[in-house]
Amino acid sequence: MSGGTPYIGSKISLISKAEIRYEGILYTIDTENSTVALAKVRSFGTEDRPTDRPIPPRDEVFEYIIFRGSDIKDLTVCEPPKPQCSLPQDPAIVQSSLGSSTSSFQSMGSYGPFGRMPTYSQFSPSSLVGQQFGAVGVAGSSLTSFGTETSNSGTLPQSSAVGSAFTQDTRSLKTQLSQGRSSPQLDPLRKSPTMEQAVQTASAHLPAPAAVGRRSPVSTRPLPSASQKAGENQEHRRAEVHKVSRPENEQLRNDNKRQVAPGAPSAPRRGRGGHRGGRGRFGIRRDGPMKFEKDFDFESANAQFNKEEIDREFHNKLKLKEDKLEKQEKPVNGEDKGDSGVDTQNSEGNADEEDPLGPNCYYDKTKSFFDNISCDDNRERRPTWAEERRLNAETFGIPLRPNRGRGGYRGRGGLGFRGGRGRGGGRGGTFTAPRGFRGGFRGGRGGREFADFEYRKTTAFGP
């Protein structure tokens, strides 16, 4: 390689240590990572070179391949860069593009996870390195030494600074090749699945660039070309496809959410009632335990009661109970008055109608045998469950139990279920309400019960 000619854009023949020959356009040389990148690469296989694993040639043309410097055996220049025709320095020219001379390097397209690569406007170091390789993944710190780009033309003058910088890169690359040094940064990148088809190296594993390189700070905005506009149109159409397919994906996701697992009770189809919760028997305190700001004042509470009146009333009650027990033990006219149901009923009727004791008198044995204190003691029938529960609530207070709500969804229609009206099990279908709920799903007035249709039950003896 001569020191005065830059080889960016030259056709390079590269032979790896696995005796595989590649041909492509020299893209860039990274001295930090000891890598060489070729664009439009084609593999010719091992050909007739002696090797343990002969590889046939391939017809595919790879967009770019990054080679590790320690695995390169030989690197020769097949064709020099094509001559560049620059426009005259005319201040009237704002922007220019060459479409015919860049046919071999246009239509690069987009590269999926690596982003869209701009097209080559010319075989210039700035357009090749600054524009395209910033989206591929080579470190951008080594890309700043390949020249600058003028703002009024699409070509670059190849200056002596470019050639000298390239000479330094090639010399350092030769030294690294002789030493056999490989970049430690590429070791974790060898097994990347995104570049297995696009990047091929001479080693057993394929290295893949992962870090997105920076653009050259000295290069200005690239000039648009016809292929660049075509790439933008292609991206616009791809974005429209994504926007159109997104509602379809959301619809499929919603449909998957609406699917009911097998064995679960289906919801009513003709639900008429909304959420009918809030009919709980006893309200559940959700604010936690009560917090008292100060201690209970027993002295002021005791001052509100008259101890003498309480003691007098208590002794009167004890005396009345003793008199009652004595009278029950003594027979009246040879018969126990409590055993005669007729006399008891008549006495009860007279006591209720006339009220001989008066409102302030609880017991007077001269007027009546019965008192006004324990009026429920003489009842022969047992109290009902509702009455006993009411008395317990009045005496001991209301127990605060969780999960006593009576509500739930009371939809009327479809093949719903009416489970959960009782305390535990359901009354229809397979749905069983949790224990303690009186509600639950109360659908199911239609369907199997035929509640919405008029019919007559016929028996063997007639309607």
Curated annotation (Swiss-Prot):
Q: Where is the composition biased (Polar residues)?
A: 147-185, 194-203
At which residues is Phosphoserine found? Answer: S178, S182, S183, S192, S216, S227
Per the record, a Pfam family? FDF
Keyword set for this entry? Acetylation, Cytoplasm, Cytoskeleton, Developmental protein, Methylation, Phosphoprotein, Repressor, Ribonucleoprotein, Translation regulation
Q: Which InterPro entries match?
A: DFDF, FDF_dom, FFD_box, Lsm14-like_N, LSM_dom_sf, Sm, TFG_box
Q: Which GO terms describe its molecular function?
A: double-stranded DNA binding; double-stranded RNA binding; mRNA binding; RNA binding; single-stranded RNA binding
Placement of sequence motif TFG box: 380-400
> Does the UniProt entry include the keyword Hydrolase?
no
Q: Which residues carry this modification: Phosphothreonine?
A: T194
Q: Which GO terms describe its cellular component?
A: cytoplasm; cytoplasmic ribonucleoprotein granule; cytoplasmic stress granule; cytosol; mitotic spindle; P-body; ribonucleoprotein complex
Region span, Disordered:
147-288, 322-359, 398-444
Q: In which compartments does the protein localize?
A: Cytoplasm, P-body; Cytoplasm, Cytoskeleton, Spindle; Cytoplasm, Stress granule
Ranges for domain Sm come to 1-81
Q: Where is the composition biased (Gly residues)?
A: 410-429
For whether the record's keyword set contains Cytoplasm, the answer is: yes
Modification type N-acetylserine: residues: S2
What spans are recorded as compositionally biased (Basic residues)? 269-283
The Asymmetric dimethylarginine modification is found at: R401
Domain DFDF, residue spans: 284-320
For this protein, the record's CDD domains field holds: LSm14_N
Bias (Basic and acidic residues): 232-258, 322-340
Quaternary structure per UniProt?
Answer: Component of a ribonucleoprotein (RNP) complex. Interacts with DDX6. Interacts with EIF4ENIF1/4E-T; promoting EIF4ENIF1/4E-T localization to P-bodies. Interacts (via FFD box) with EDC4.
| Entry function | Essential for formation of P-bodies, cytoplasmic structures that provide storage sites for translationally inactive mRNAs and protect them from degradation. Acts as a repressor of mRNA translation. May play a role in mitotic spindle assembly.
Tell what the record comments on domains: The LSM14 domain and the RGG repeats are required for accumulation in P-bodies, and the region containing the FDF motif is responsible for cytoplasmic retention.
Sequence similarity: Belongs to the LSM14 family.
Q: Under what name is this protein listed?
A: Protein LSM14 homolog A
